[in-house]
Amino acid sequence: MPRGRKSRRRRNARAAEENRNNRKIQASEASETPMAASVVASTPEDDLSGPEEDPSTPEEASTTPEEASSTAQAQKPSVPRSNFQGTKKSLLMSILALIFIMGNSAKEALVWKVLGKLGMQPGRQHSIFGDPKKIVTEEFVRRGYLIYKPVPRSSPVEYEFFWGPRAHVESSKLKVMHFVARVRNRCSKDWPCNYDWDSDDDAEVEAILNSGARGYSAP
């Protein structure tokens, strides 16, 4: 057999073995944390898009959540988009959903309590994400999807998360609640239930939740 053909076969065999190993790791992770499989399966491909480059500026990082929301809405038509797919998107959608259902902010301790059900702990390496705290508190914040800041007058200091300006631009309340409905349909006992509606879309959102996303198509 020609040497070039042998070399290609060896490379193909190595690539196939690597793919098999990656699938085994992901299957193991999902079997240990059933909610993880539910969250990933519940995330539609068009729920969120985002840039691979760093979109944030020092001004964005220092804005209040209210300023971020109004600024994002004003910039909505001109914000560039590119694919932000896969497991990171599922993780981000989980956090955005939690922030929303907790009344537009979520304390860091609660975020990690919920993510713990996905097999993610701060300071502990995850087989898929690596360092989850770095992704959540650095990458998602740097890209403008989350705002991460101290809780006023907390002692010892606590931190909380808000939707960042890019999350307001690239997602929506209905998309996030559609995601929550699908997750709840699989593992409702793992999600908090103290919803705090604050918009004119209450009836439509409640319909999504009550239906468990069966037969409902988000706009």
From Swiss-Prot:
Biased composition, class Basic residues, residue ranges: 1-13
Residue spans of biased composition, Acidic residues class: 44-57
SMART domains in alphabetical order: MAGE
Low complexity compositional bias, start-end: 58-74
Gene: MAGEH1
InterPro entries: MAGE (IPR037445), MAGE_WH2 (IPR041899), MHD_dom (IPR002190)
Pfam families linked to this entry: MAGE
GO annotation (BP), single: negative regulation of transcription by RNA polymerase II
Stretches assigned to the MAGE domain: 1-198
Keywords from the named record: Phosphoprotein, Tumor antigen
A GO cellular-component term linked to this record: nucleus
Residues recorded as bearing Phosphotyrosine in the entry: Y195
Region (Disordered): 1-84
Protein name as it appears in the record: Melanoma-associated antigen H1
